[in-house]
Amino acid sequence: MKKQLKFKLLAITLISILATIGIGCDRIFTKPFQLPASAKQEPWPIQTGLRAGILRDNIPTVNRIVLVPDEATFLAAIQKWNLKGNWPILIEDKKYAPMFLQRFQPEEIVRLPSIKPQRPKNQKLQQLMLNSAAAAWNATDTQTLKAKWTQLGWEPPGVVITSENDPARSAAVALAAAHGQPLVFLEDNFGKPNDTLNNTQWKNLQLAVTKAVESTGFFYSQLADPIDTITIVRQLAVKYQSPEKPDEQLAVTDGLGRHPNGERWAAVGWIYGSEVRSIYQAMCAIFLDTETAMLYDSYPKEGNWGKYEMEEAASGLKTIGLNVEVVQKPESSLEKWRSLASKPWTFDLILMNSKGYPKSFQVGNGDASVEDLPKLQFPAAIHMIHSWSAAAPDDKNTVAGRWLENGAYAYIGSVNEPFLSAFIPPKLMVDRLKRGAPFLIAARQLESPPWKVATIGDPLMSIAKPRPRIPPTQQPM
């Protein structure tokens, strides 16, 4: 009897030890950056947002801002990012850096002197950029970076494409580092931002982008595989000639990321411009939280216009904690708009329903001009239901151009006459945002053939819960 009791006690002890070992092994072999199996049942836009959310949850933001005088110092500074924390780094100027500072409100501001020499001896620029992006993941180069991702269970949600000869190139490094994406280079000439590509140029761009994504070695050809976004960070044309209707132009950011039959395999965002502004746009997308919103509706309540009403969208944004201001008919008018625009706006998110042309937009009972657009005190993400606003986004005398010049870091607008149905109704867009879909993806007609809505900004930027911050003392430079 005593022997049986001893045997039972021994068996219970052994089972307990094995269970403890099993739990310990689970902890050892758990991959902290892996997308949970349950998430893979979600639609691909939600999966993409959840991937970005994994990094927000696991890599805290250090409550500091680093200001640098030039690009070389920026690339040196970004190599201090790591898996224990990262922080905004901007090239100091008199316009965009102050806007970011005022909105971010850091506990610590660090100004770095210009580094000498500007680049390590015998190191090529592309290699420096790749190594700088890898350093944020405690890796030294592309090879060790991929090994680190495998170790952590991380699957990149997208690819960043830039040119080593483009002033926006350092923003590409930041987006690759922050979102855990491969960085690849595309050096050909594909036009200037206000241009229209002809059929030959467009086919060349499509092929070049697809080859660039293929070169990473990650699966990309279907939605909900790892690569579902492309971030182009360099100069190229905003639109291309429609193959079916030569007098119509389609949005390059909607035409890319598709198979020859038009089926989508990725959503595309685009950042271009000076090194100062492009880095600013990248840092806004990575680090800024969304707490306030302006919803301006100039549409009548009747007919199809009524489907684009803003009240339900406003209610949805309030449920995720945003402070929302709504202006709609009969209140929306030229007088009301000019009153609102008479002082700088502090809204993080701006959703607007309008009609018009590249240089004018309807605000209720009349047309406002580009000169009536408000200054921005804080950076903003903007969705503009309107025709032609993004036809020439590098021209500050157009609607999109002025919003971007004023400090918008993400912008959704049309390059041509798109018709109302090209845009997602605000309620549906907000429903997608609430579920975690990134901003640019939430605004897309995801099943339609290539059309006319351009998406400018980081395609992984989400309207998400505030990022956790840690004090600078926990992560010294």
Name each region found by the language model.
Residues T73-L75, W81, K95-E108, K116-M477:
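Cysteine-dependent hydrolase recognition
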Residues I28-R64, L128-Q143:
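N-terminal low-complexity, Pro/Thr/Ser-rich intrinsically disordered segments
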Residues V66-L67, L90, I109-L112, I350-M352:
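Short, hydrophobic beta-strand segments that form beta-sheet elements in well-ordered domains
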Residues A11-T20:
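Bacterial N-terminal signal peptides
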Residues L55-V68, G153-W154, G158-T162:
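Glycine-rich loop/turn
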Residues K84-W87:
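Short helix-loop boundary/capping segments at the starts of domains
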Residues K2-A11:
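Bacterial N-terminal signal peptides that target proteins for export
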